[in-house]
Regions:
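Short, flexible loop segments at the rims of nucleotide/cofactor-binding pockets, characterized by
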Residues: 42-44, 66-69
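Conserved catalytic-core segment of nucleotide-activated headgroup transferases in glycan assembly
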Residues: 3-44
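Single conserved hydrophobic/aromatic residue that forms the stacking wall/gate
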Residues: 1-5, 9, 229-236
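Conserved helix-loop functional segments at active or binding sites
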Residues: 29-33, 63, 70
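Residue-level marker for well-ordered alpha-helical positions
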Residues: 25, 51-52, 76-77
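Short acidic alpha-helix that forms the nucleotide-activated donor recognition element
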Residues: 52-60
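Catalytic cores of eukaryotic secretory-pathway lumenal/extracellular enzymes that build
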Residues: 43-52
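Catalytic binding pocket for nucleotide-activated donors in carbohydrate/polymer assembly enzymes
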Residues: 59-60, 67-204, 208-213, 218, ...
């Protein structure tokens, strides 16, 4: 209390994250109030996400979207839990998605986006410009501009929506626009494949069967043999 150096000041770290949540809640209201769309689509923001909520979501999921920018995800376990419950992954080559892809094969996963190496190269060269993509891609421009459209502004807060729009066009640190078109194409492919129930069931079974690789027994054994110590060292 007596040290001025320990004072904590307000920072901007989570402003964009809150703007994204605000965008989702605004879209939620927009979809809910549209009589032509509401019967076919629903957006739900799960608040206070915890284990109890996860126990309902994991078994119910058909497509697990793990869409972090390649090189940004260390390795979560959510995708493994979805996989064990039969969900098919749609994601980037990042985190445990890399191992899932190797296990199930390209026919049983939907991979999109730039590689980690390419993304890191963009950061090193500082040559990524979201505005160039925005101004030269009609579909991307239309989608980004929808954030600040009359329909959205009528339901949401102008400050939040305009700030998020500006972030995507002027900075886009996580290179959202870079992978956008590839994501849309893979999502469309996944939804089309989902319509073939027999083929989709096979994809689900492959994912369930291959999920055993992520068991704690196998993981602990590997840590023991490769990272912590070997049996020979233990004997010594």
């Amino acid at each position: 209390k007596s040290s001025a150096a320990s004072d904590v000041y307000k920072r901007q770290a989570y402003v964009i994250a809150k703007d994204i949540i605000h965008l989702l809640l605004t879209l939620q209201d927009l979809i809910k109030d549209d009589p032509e769309v509401a019967p076919y689509m629903k957006l739900v923001m799960v608040e206070n996400y915890n284990v109890s909520a996860a126990e309902k979501l994991f078994p119910a999921c058909d497509i697990s979207e793990q869409i972090s920018l390649a090189s940004k995800e260390a390795s979560g376990t959510g995708n493994m839990k979805f996989m064990l419950n039969g969900a098919v992954t749609l994601g980037t080559m990042d985190g445990a998605n890399v191992e899932i892809s190797e296990l199930v094969g390209e026919d049983n996963i939907y991979i999109f986006g730039e590689s980690s190496e390419k993304v890191i190269e963009h950061y090193e060269k500082a040559d990524y410009c979201s505005r160039d993509i925005y101004e030269n891609d009609k579909r991307i421009k239309e989608c980004v501009d929808f954030i600040v459209s009359e329909k959205m502004l009528a339901l949401g807060h102008k400050e939040n929506l305009e700030r998020l729009h500006h972030e995507l066009v002027s900075k886009d640190w996580f290179m959202t626009l870079l992978d956008f078109n590839d994501y849309v194409e893979k999502k469309d492919q996944a939804l089309a494949d989902y319509a073939d129930r027999k083929t989709w069931a096979k994809k689900m079974l492959v994912n369930i069967a291959k999920a055993g690789f992520f068991s704690s027994d196998r993981t602990i054994e590997q840590y023991n043999n490769c990272l912590l110590y070997t049996s020979d060292a233990a004997d010594d």
